[in-house]
Swiss-Prot record:
This is ABC-type organic anion transporter ABCA8A. PROSITE patterns: ABC_TRANSPORTER_1, ABC_TRANSPORTER_2. PANTHER family: ABC-TYPE ORGANIC ANION TRANSPORTER ABCA8A (PTHR19229:SF186), ATP-BINDING CASSETTE TRANSPORTER SUBFAMILY A ABCA (PTHR19229). It comes from Mus musculus. Keywords: ATP-binding, Cell membrane, Glycoprotein, Membrane, Nucleotide-binding, Repeat, Translocase, Transmembrane, Transmembrane helix, Transport. One of its GO terms (molecular function) is ATP binding. It is found in: Cell membrane; Basolateral cell membrane. Cholesterol efflux is increased by extracellularly applied taurocholate. One of its GO terms (cellular component) is basolateral plasma membrane. GO terms for biological process: cholesterol efflux; cholesterol transport; positive regulation of cholesterol efflux; regulation of cholesterol efflux; sphingomyelin biosynthetic process; xenobiotic transport. Residues 478-713, 1284-1517 form the ABC transporter domain. It catalyses: taurocholate(in) + ATP + H2O = taurocholate(out) + ADP + phosphate + H(+); cholesterol(in) + ATP + H2O = cholesterol(out) + ADP + phosphate + H(+). Belongs to the ABC transporter superfamily. ABCA family. InterPro entries: AAA+_ATPase (IPR003593), ABC2_TM (IPR013525), ABC_transporter-like_ATP-bd (IPR003439), ABC_transporter-like_CS (IPR017871), ABCA (IPR026082), P-loop_NTPase (IPR027417), R2_ABCA1-4-like (IPR056264).
């Protein structure tokens, strides 16, 4: 065992290197990640280029002059209502000097005023009186008053234009607002009090209070820039969230079992993205400083703010990846949190929140970052330009600390929830668990201590358990007691394990067997630490699985091979092994040696530099096993370690485990009973979570086996009844198990072995019976399993007590007869559709298929909803904007806007009102009048202040003159936009209070509704965005054919008889209406919301429907053409969407350029299909506009361009048809629309002579040649493969040298007769897959020909039945939907299809799964579905490629029975390929074995066993160890060439050469004598299995010259595909 020491630094470095390689090799994701980041940075630069920043220097006070200096003759006044008081007031206003010559009109009401203004005048001021003291000054929007309500803290309130200084509040003074306000206020005072103050009001003087230096930002671009700052790291958080979530879900638990520390996992991701964040922050800070978005704050402060924000988002992504299990949901939540919390920070920008709440919300890092940015802007706005260039960053430093705190806080929450959430549903983990001292320890000991105290040695008293040999007592390595595991899903409790008790011994290989869902994987997961038991306890080498410290020891001792493959696809084989070696704690200097050892052990040297994603499924499985054996562990926990491996690789794994059995513990699960039989010393059967039995193969076969299988190969002259009579004569309770042409099989009871010598002697001495050869084999573990499962379904409590179940077995003849009857009912020829009726049915089936797929395509639906939502949102926002623009508003002008009330605490930005008395007299009466207005005053009674030098005040009133005649100077802080109108009201009310203390004047400002004069501009702006949106949609809804091609569903449809035109038009029949509906829905929404004057007519709608429909068809079929061309690459819907967008964008730009409009418009409509929507819409809009102005006859010809999309559609249909004919897959039927007929490929002679062939292969070649030339169609086989050869072009190693050809098959000839199932077997690379592809038509043969159903041209079948190795299914469709669609494709009528579906579902027990989506099905049920699809419609030729892979034995039996029932005694033939020899033995009438591209042998299974089987297997079980040596001496005397195999002492195993055993009668006679002499418990003698024959023949592939012509990688991967 290699020394292992867990090292966090080593693990972190290994994982970091893995992440770096991930970035390097997943180039597309890395490119997009950095592209999006770069685009956001470019957006920052763009906004800053458009952004205006004002660095305003300090300025002393500015005198605006007297109020009566206003002089403007361009406006008029309209007032309402008309009352004597309002008339007197306005008459007095008309006498003011600057009102001379101005019109003042009276209006009875506001509606009349608005109408009057809209009809006659453009520059009007409205005066609306509420009462004698309250009125509203109403202006046209944007005229004479500012358009905003108030300055914001960060916006510029003054601008410098050379020597001219302009401040926003001066607009009130300069354009007449305060002049008119002062005149009206003076008139109100005079009318209501009979005291004139007109002179005082007209002498008002305005001044700016001293303007401090400031840096001001400008408006919307600031908000946009801040928003982009918030989402600057979103591309990084998206990819880190997705990567971490996927890796945690798939790999982290498995790596933790190997010893991975949590800190190493998070550090590896954090360090990588920390560096990326550092670089992005550096660039962002540089941009901010270069463009001077922030002036006064130093580089490091800004850098720190951005950097800690980025790190906090990384921590937030980690936290969300723990809380949420799906990567899509994690990405979405992180992005929404970033946007929402960051946008909430705008409340800090506009001071909507109290400071305390701002700091509380800073626990959300996006808000804290936004608060920091706001603080930077405020520093620029408030701090003098000559101050320290670092500013006053105390608040910013506090925010940076909060961001640092947020990052640490999120990390702590990540660690906390990672410990709590996975264990929350088990025992004592609670949310206050973090308060305990053992927070980071997994503690399950509360339920173990009692069990340990009461522990006793467990004895199996049931006779279902074979007693353990004495030599293993005290070698208990794994002890399991009362183990229970419950799963809770949707409030439903499922017991995976139920009180399971078991010991696993050192020095033994133990197999866990059981049906799917029995609990095998759950048990192994509990033992490996991947999940926690509900109750019970486990010790491994005296280490308690419940203790954290013991778990670490266990991880060092254990090698785990889980059911799913463990590897990173973007790493090579060698890199994966190095990574996991370091995770396991193998010392750095030993890693390379250990990796080399594993590569050699598993024969993976040729694949060590291949990326895992390019490996076959079997090679990936082998790599997972290699990772498990890294470090030479003492305990192997293997969950189906050889699933998917070819026989050679499987035997290599078996030999590896056998060689290391002595000092180690091997516990594995498997679905292959033969594997358990050959490899395991002890087999443990689990059913529904309970332990059923355990023992050696011999024990189990004797107790539950059905006996020996006697197989006889017969000549044509044999008489079946005579042979059966002879067998019954010797063994009356024997049973005939199988009968077919040339073959008989019997079951002989185990307890009748004493009768075997006489039976075999009579068989050997009776040549007249027509027996060519015979063989005998012991019952298989599969039969034991089926009998156990049959018993467990009857009685869960007791196995071994019901004799009738043992006799009947789990798979009774009645069940087979039932399956045969159900399937045979389908063999009658149902009437199939043809011609256009079939084409239309296929079209409808594909349309339905496309609808069902879109229903579950989340991304496409999101895109459609998003596009529709954006379009409708744009229309809604345009209407809201129009409504706002056309609506009026009214803003109050009151002192509380800027000034405190008496006794109020200081509250920025409110201040006291400064009163400066420069009259030299007391002004107590005026002061008292001001105090009546509830204003906090600060009075300079002696006039010592200037009043305009202190910018801390919002406003000041400076009184001069004498006590009888005041002169007022109004000084305003330029930051307060409405200061002048407010101070005018304060002065007016001060004067009014002298005469009428209870009265109060109130002035408001408002605007008139704006006229709707932007209709055309609105339409064009909407239209531009709408066209660009629509251009992005087709790639997302019309490129699913790429998915169909890559998962081979398209090939499955083609081989099922689908016409190419029906496939494409069927998809279009659904997609075109969806796309049209999307376009027209936005059109209709626009029309519905448009103003009455812009409503379109029915004729307009007709024209738009015409060109929209044509555009949809043309662009959808253009997308089909693109999909066909790029079907072998990635789908890249987003990239093609971007291309469509760019083409549409530039096309629109050319169309909208006035100079080129007429030329570009017509050219682009005619030549650029994506531009036709925009072009036709713009053309239609222009035709409509021109028709309203002037009639131009030549414009009538422009309507012909609306037919351009239909022309494009026809062109793309023709292109698609030509591509299908030239480059498409071979069709099975004549396409009535595309006019494509099944191709008849040219036949080339095979250049290679078949020298040195086996005689059976030569005979098959002759028979095939005769069948090929036979004129009797009825006698022709279902499949004829004659002289097939396939060559592939190899890659050039040098541009000078010619590339070597790779020969996949050389000269293959065989046929499949009607009613026959032929098995095609071979090692990986032998040529099986290529042969299948040539038969299906997927690959053209280089020489030779294939005939199906008797003819290669005129009478080809309309479709083939094909069950591919990979499940060519749509994951979101249900089983019934699959069956209905394929039935329609094959031409079955609906009534016939429903009957067939029900019967096939009954035959294969699929009734419960008919409504289940495929993605929820087990692998075994998926294989059943693929098989049913292959035989649906009664095809005459069926190809089955490993049909029972992934099934448990029960499912395999169902499948095999269905295959036998489907083809037995019918006119159909089947070709089956498999790696599972038991499957071939169960269903094949004949077997052909391929070696190195050649047919090595062919014949019945018994014939091949007799011809090529070299050995028999003898197993004997002794009662006492003392018998071993004498018995061994006797066996060696009787069988001199016997080879003893390694087993534990009570079980003796020998391999006997065939010549030592023949004749069988003598062999059994000798063994019966031995049994009596040595009092053996039991023995068995069995012929070589087909697997052993296959292995012997396949070894020739390594010895011949086949590899000389092939690249070394051919040994590890399937033969090259033609399309590659």
């Amino acid at each position: 065992m290699v020394k292992r020491e867990i090292n966090v630094c080593q693990q972190t470095w290994a994982l970091l290197c893995k992440n770096l390689l991930r970035k390097k090799r997943l180039k597309r994701d890395t490119f997009l990640e950095f592209l999006y980041t770069a685009l956001i940075l470019l957006s920052l630069i763009l906004f800053l280029q458009l952004h205006e920043v004002y660095d305003f220097s300090s300025l002393p006070d500015v005198d605006l002059g007297r109020i009566d200096s206003f002089n403007d003759s361009t406006f008029m006044i309209v007032y309402t209502p008309i009352t004597p008081t309002t008339q007197r007031i306005m008459d007095r206003v008309s006498l003011v000097s600057y009102m001379t010559g101005r019109k003042i009109l009276a209006s009875p009401n506001e509606e009349n005023m608005t109408e009057l203004i809209s009809m006659r005048f453009s520059d009007v001021v409205g005066v609306i009186f509420t009462n004698a003291y309250s009125y509203n000054l109403k202006f046209i929007k944007g005229a004479r008053i500012p358009t905003i309500k108030e300055h914001q803290d960060h916006t510029a309130h003054c601008h410098s234009y050379g020597e001219i200084i302009y401040c926003g509040l001066s607009e009130f003074w300069r354009d007449g607002f305060v002049a008119l306000q002062a005149a009206i206020n003076a008139a109100i005072i005079e009318v209501t009090t009979n005291h004139s103050v007109m002179e005082e009001m007209m002498s008002l003087t305005g001044k700016y209070i001293k303007i401090d230096s400031f840096v001001g930002q400008e408006g919307t671009t600031t908000d946009c820039f801040l928003f982009f700052c918030i989402i600057r790291f979103s591309p990084l958080t998206y990819y880190i969230s997705a990567g971490v979530t996927r890796e945690r879900k798939k790999m982290k638990g498995l790596m933790a079992v190997m010893g991975l520390r949590d800190s190493a996992f998070w550090l590896s991701w954090g360090l990588l993205y920390g560096v990326i964040v550092f670089v992005v922050t550096l660039l962002s800070t540089t941009i901010v400083k270069l463009v001077q978005f922030v002036f006064l704050t130093g580089f490091m402060v800004i850098f720190s703010l951005f950097f800690f924000y980025g790190l906090s988002l990384i921590s937030l992504s980690f936290l969300m990846s723990v809380l949420l299990k799906k990567s899509f949901l994690t990405d979405l939540v992180v992005f929404l949190l970033t946007v929402s919390c960051g946008s909430l920070g705008f409340t800090a920008l506009y001071r909507y929140l109290p400071v305390s709440l701002e700091w509380l919300l800073s626990l959300l890092s996006p808000f804290a970052f936004m608060l920091g940015m706001v603080q930077l802007l405020r520093l620029d706005y408030d701090v003098n330009s000559n101050a320290d260039p670092m500013g006053n960053p105390n608040e910013v430093i506090g925010t940076i600390f909060m961001l640092f705190f947020d990052g640490v806080f999120y990390l702590l929450l990540t660690f906390y929830f990672e410990k709590v959430l996975p264990s929350k549903s088990f025992h004592d983990k609670t949310y206050w668990h973090a308060c305990k001292s053992h927070f980071f320890l997994i503690d399950y000991s509360f339920y173990i201590r009692t069990a340990l105290d009461n522990e006793t040695d467990y004895e199996f008293s049931d006779d279902s358990f074979e007693p353990v040999s004495m030599e293993f007592h005290g070698k208990e390595a794994i002890r399991i007691r009362n183990l229970t595991k419950d799963y809770i899903q949707k409030s439903k409790r499922t017991e995976a394990l139920k009180d399971l008790t078991l010991d696993v011994y050192k020095g033994q290989i133990t197999a866990i067997l059981g049906h799917s869902g029995a609990g095998k994987s759950t048990l192994l997961n509990v033992l490996s630490g991947l999940c926690v038991p509900t109750k019970g306890w486990v010790t491994i080498h005296n280490n308690k699985l419940s203790e954290m410290t013991d778990l670490e020891n266990i991880s060092k001792l254990t090698g785990v091979c889980p059911q799913c493959n463990v590897q990173f696809d973007f790493l090579t084989v060698r890199e994966n092994l190095r990574l996991f070696a370091k995770i396991k704690g193998i010392q750095a200097h030993e890693v390379d040696n250990e990796v080399q050892r594993v590569l050699l052990e598993l024969d993976m040297k040729n694949t060590q530099n291949i990326l895992v994603q390019n490996l076959s499924g079997g090679q990936k499985r082998k790599l997972t096993f290699g990772i498990a054996i890294l470090g030479d562990p003492q305990i192997f926990l293997l969950d189906e370690p050889t699933a998917g491996l070819d026989p050679f690789s499987r035997h290599r794994v078996w030999n590896f485990l056998k060689e290391r059995r002595a000092d180690r513990v091997v516990l594995f699960s498997t679905q292959f009973m033969d594997e358990a039989d050959i490899l395991a010393d002890r087999k443990v059967f689990i059913s529904k979570g309970k332990l059923k039995c355990a023992g050696s193969s011999l024990f189990l076969k004797k107790k539950w086996g059905i006996g020996y299988h006697l197989s006889l190969q017969l000549s044509e002259t044999c008489v079946h009844e005579r042979i059966t009579s002879l067998v019954k004569q010797h063994i009356p309770d024997s049973k005939l198990s199988a009968e077919s042409e040339g073959k008989l099989s019997y079951i002989l009871p185990l307890e009748r072995t004493n009768k075997f010598p006489d039976l075999y002697r009579d068989l050997e001495r009776s040549p007249d019976l027509g027996i060519e050869n015979y063989g005998v084999s012991i019952t298989t573990l599969t039969e034991v399993f089926l009998k156990l499962e049959g018993k467990s379904s009857i009685d869960q409590s007791d196995i071994g007590m019901t004799e009738d179940v043992q006799a009947g077995g789990a798979r009774s003849p009645e069940r087979f007869a039932e399956v045969e009857q159900l399937v045979s009912l389908l063999n009658g020829r149902c009437k199939m559709k043809g011609g256009m009726a079939l084409w239309w049915q296929q079209l409808c089936a594909v349309t339905r298929l496309r609808f069902l797929k879109l229903k579950h395509e989340r991304k496409s639906i999101v895109i459609l909803i998003l596009v529709l939502g954006i379009g409708l949102l744009h229309i809604l926002s345009a209407n809201i904007y129009r409504m706002v623009r056309q609506s009026d508003y009214c803003w109050e002008l009151a002192p509380h806007m800027y000034f405190l009330t008496p006794g109020q605490q200081p509250q920025p930005p409110l201040t006291n009102l400064l009163i400066v008395n420069k009259t030299g007299a007391k002004i107590d009466d005026f002061i008292h009048s001001l105090e009546q207005q509830n204003i906090a005053l600060e009075v300079d009674a002696f006039g010592t202040r200037n009043g305009t030098e202190d910018s801390q005040y919002n406003g000041a009133i400076i009184l001069s003159g004498d006590e009888k005649n005041y002169n007022f100077t109004l000084a305003c802080n330029t930051k307060r936009l409405n200061c002048f109108p407010v101070l005018v009201d304060i002065v007016s009310n001060g004067l009014l209070g002298l005469f009428a203390p209870s009265a109060h004047i109130q002035t408001d400002r408002s605007t008139f509704p704006e006229e709707n004069d932007h209709r055309k501009f609105d339409y064009l702006a909407y239209f531009f965005l709408w066209v660009l949106l629509m251009a992005c949609v087709p790639p997302y809804i019309s490129m699913t054919s790429i998915d169909d091609y890559k998962n081979r569903a398209q090939f499955q449809l083609w081989i099922s008889g689908l016409s190419p035109s029906a496939y494409w038009f069927g998809q279009a029949l659904f997609e075109v209406p969806v796309y049209c509906a999307l376009i027209l829905s936005i059109f209709i929404a626009f029309y519905a919301s448009a103003p009455p004057e812009s409503k379109f007519t029915v004729g307009d709608l007709f024209i738009q429907i015409l060109y929209v429909g044509g555009y949809a068809m043309s662009v959808i079929f253009m997308t089909y053409v693109i999909s066909f061309i790029y079907r072998k690459g990635r789908k890249n819907s987003g990239l093609w969407s971007l291309c469509f967008y760019i083409v549409s964008f530039f096309s629109m730009c050319f169309m909208l350029i006035d100079y080129f409009r007429d030329i570009s418009l017509f050219v682009l409509i005619a030549l650029v299909p994506p531009a036709t929507l925009g072009g036709c819409t713009l053309l239609h809009f222009e035709n409509r506009e021109f028709s309203e102005i002037i009639f131009e006859p030549e414009r009538e010809y422009s309507y012909l361009f609306f037919l351009a999309p239909l022309l494009h559609f026809a062109i793309f249909v023709v292109i698609l048809r030509c591509m299908e004919r030239k480059f498409g897959m071979k069709t099975m039927r004549t396409d009535p629309v595309f006019r494509i007929s099944p191709r008849s490929d040219r036949v080339f002679n095979n250049p290679e002579d078949p020298d040195g062939e086996d005689e059976d292969v030569s005979q098959e070649r002759v028979w095939t040649a005769n069948a090929l030339t036979s004129a009797d169609f009825q006698e022709k086989p279902a499949i004829i493969a004659s002289c097939l050869r396939k060559e592939y072009k190899g890659k050039k190693k040098c541009f000078v040298l010619k590339s070597k050809k790779k020969i996949a098959t050389r000269n293959i000839s065989f046929c499949v007769r009607k009613g026959e199932v032929v098995g095609l077997l071979g090692h990986n690379g032998a040529g099986k897959s290529t042969s299948i592809k040539m038969i299906t038509g997927e690959t053209k043969p280089s020489a030779g020909q294939v005939l199906l159903k008797g003819s290669s041209t005129g009478d080809t079948p309309g479709f083939l039945g094909y069950c591919p190795q990979e499940n060519a299914l749509w994951l979101n469709l249900t089983v019934r939907e699959h069956l209905e669609i394929f039935a329609a494709i094959k031409g079955m009528r609906k009534s016939d299809a429903n009957v067939a579906i029900e019967r096939l579902a009954d035959a294969l027990k699929l009734q419960d799964q008919l409504k289940s989506p495929v993605k929820t099905l087990s692998e075994g049920v998926k294989r059943k579905l693929c098989f049913v699809l292959s035989i649906l419609g009664n095809p005459s030729v069926v190809l089955l490629d490993e049909p029972s892979t992934g099934m448990d034995p029960e499912g395999q039996q169902q499948m095999w029975q269905a295959i036998q029932a489907t083809f037995s005694n019918t006119e159909r033939g089947a070709l089956l390929t498999t790696h599972y020899m038991a499957e071939a033995e169960a269903v094949c009438d004949r077997v052909a074995i391929m070696v190195s591209g050649r047919l090595r042998c062919i014949g019945s299974i018994q014939h091949l066993k007799s011809k090529f089987g070299k050995e028999y297997l003898l197993e004997m079980k002794v009662k006492t160890p003392s018998q071993v040596e004498p018995l061994n001496t006797e066996i060696m005397r009787l069988f001199p060439q016997a080879a003893r195999q390694e087993r534990y002492s009570s079980l003796m195993v020998y391999k006997l050469p065939r010549e030592d055993v023949q004749p069988l009668s003598q062999a059994f006679f000798k063994l019966e004598t031995v049994k009596q002499s040595f009092d053996l418990e039991e023995y068995s003698l069995s012929q070589s299995t087909l697997e052993q024959v296959f292995l012997e023949l396949s070894k020739e592939q390594e010895l011949d010259g086949f590899e000389e012509e092939l690249d070394p990688s051919v040994k590890w991967k399937l033969l090259p595909q033609e399309e590659a």
